[in-house]
Amino acid sequence: MSSQPRKILVTSALPYANGSIHLGHLLEHIQTDIWTRFQRMCGHEIYSVCADDAHGTPVMLKAQELGITPEEMVARTREEHHQDLLDFFVEYDNYHVTHSDENKELSELIYNRLNDAGYISKRTISQLFDPEKNMFLPDRFVKGTCPSCGAEDQNGDSCDNCGATYDPTEMKNPRSVVSGATPILKDSEHFFFDLPQFSDMLQNWLKSDALQSEISNKLEEWFEKGLQQWDISRDAPYFGFEIPGAPNKFFYVWVDAPVGYMASFKNLCDRSGINFDEYWGADSDAELYHFIGKDITYFHCLFWPAMLEGAGFRKPTGVNVHGFVTVNGAKMSKSKGTFIKGRTYLEHLNPEYLRYYFASKLGANVTDIDLNFEDFAQKVNSDLVGKVVNIASRCASFITKRFDGKLSDNVLEPALVAEFQHAQASIAQAFEERQYHKAIREIMALADKANQFIDANAPWVTIKDESKQAFTHDVCSLGINLFRLLMVYLKPVVPKLAEQAEAFLNDDLSWSSAQSVLTGHEINKFKALMQRVDMDKVNAMVDDSKENLAPTVTLDPNSPLAKDPISDTIEFDDFAKIDLRIAKIVVAEHVEKADKLLRLELDLGGETRQVFAGIKSAYQPEDLVGKLTVMVANLAPRKMRFGMSEGMVLAAGPGGKDLWIMEPHEGAQPGMKVK
């Protein structure tokens, strides 16, 4: 790691202005803030900027829904986002918004330079159009049936069921999410950026140290398919910046969103006298880093550097990509209460719990981070409270009560102090490389050694022996110094705790101060620095995050529920009469002269039943043997011309090939009752 002062500009991806900050956002902002604070502690000149991403159809429609202008909604949301981040101790030098004069000026400048250089072209394309709302529909505002697998209610550009990607015009039974109307095809002239012209430059850039290897490898797929021209325009009505010289044509949000990094920094420069070109000019020797999530990689690693190159600006030094946040091993869920907004978290828990936990799991790769609440409580309570803060609380009272609040002039074990100080280099390297989990692991190993030292010397015992007062003073003073070193290393992660420690220690914690020891130094009276995580508060947070999603669901007229509505309500006693059991299919065979039936022999775990099931159109008999399914076991036997049917297997679907028998999860056994 360089010891020379560096000039660095850091950005985080811009939160979109139509929703609240949640834990997924916070992973990235905390990751960025830790790195920024570390660099600043090391004495480097670093600026961090962010902004709200304000443009696009979703913002326009949300504002209409609220009965306010998009500008009003964006201003309100930006204030909310910024305050949430501040309350998690995420401090940007500037937090701006993309609907700004600076962003309009820079977006037009970049576009005009690209256009003058011949990188912009126009052509007519056909798009889905909502005839009721009189607007073209972005991909996310079209739903329909997947053209690949036939799954219904899929997004306009990709299928959650089979993973296929496609053009919205390829969907079957498309409908507008805005009005529910069936969209029509309509022609419109669009503007395109000639991305293929930058193919060689981008491939060379991908091979540099700017990206993690897994990201570079993934992006190679784009070159294997061949880069395509990028549609950079959208038609009115649209909330955004109008393209110069093109009435009712607007920049696509992903054109001006990354320009928002430049605009936020320019806003800071104009207020603070910083030289903008020293950081964004083509010959800049400053470092520029973007922290982003893996879902927006291709915008930042293909389109954005090509735009910068074509417009005569510098490219990023590095794009640091992280994974998603899962909660308790699963995708965040509003119904389960694990889609947790930042403000809801703050109403229940200390923000530094989350900062520390994320740091303990964050590396420089793109792996998803799981927030397991039991592990979260155990790690924070064990590490921060039980190890680090405990060192100070075990030693401080003796210093205050017996030694007038002054540390000893003597350093009892210089070798132990030297070990703590020597670790600074490897901890710094881990922070520099964004291997926060390695830094935390090493810091906690040192905390263990500090506690072992205190345990071995037991000041609570020696304080009772008048002949060992000086020794006790030395032990507790060294304990306080070890705590101080740990807090220097943890300061980028838990800045508020470090601030409280500074007040207690009566000392400023800088990265360089780790090479000194406090002797004969007066400290202040110790106050509790951090409370343990209370699982009752965690559970209350989850409960407060649960949402009843039923009111937000709109019925798709082509959905199974619309075609086959729910039957009349029955009493529980009626349902309780049905005996559902797990059954194993041991025999499956065709029934001669039957068009729809298969004959099944079902093992109920001690009893075998014969059932004729109308699933021949969907299954080959050999594919069913060995499967577990669910059957109605107490249905009266029914005599058929092929034999006696002694029950019924359960299946879902409209019929034909679209039938699926019920299959229980692994662990179910034949004969088990389904309740």
UniProtKB/Swiss-Prot annotation:
GO terms for biological process: methionyl-tRNA aminoacylation. One of its GO terms (molecular function) is metal ion binding. Residues 574-675 form the tRNA-binding domain. InterPro entries: aa-tRNA-synth_I_CS, Anticodon_Met, Met-tRNA-synth_bsu_C, Met-tRNA_ligase_1, Met-tRNA_synth, Methionyl/Leucyl_tRNA_Synth, MetRS_core, MetRS_Zn. A motif ('KMSKS' region) lies at residues 331-335. ATP binds at K334. It holds the Pfam family tRNA_bind. The keyword Metal-binding applies. The keyword Coiled coil does not apply. Zn(2+) binds at C146, C149, C159, C162. It catalyses: tRNA(Met) + L-methionine + ATP = L-methionyl-tRNA(Met) + AMP + diphosphate. It is an enzyme of class 6 (ligase). Binds 1 zinc ion per subunit. A motif ('HIGH' region) lies at residues 15-25. It is found in: Cytoplasm. Its cofactor is Zn(2+). Its EC number is 6.1.1.10. Belongs to the class-I aminoacyl-tRNA synthetase family. MetG type 1 subfamily. This is Methionine--tRNA ligase. It comes from Pseudoalteromonas atlantica (strain T6c / ATCC BAA-1087).
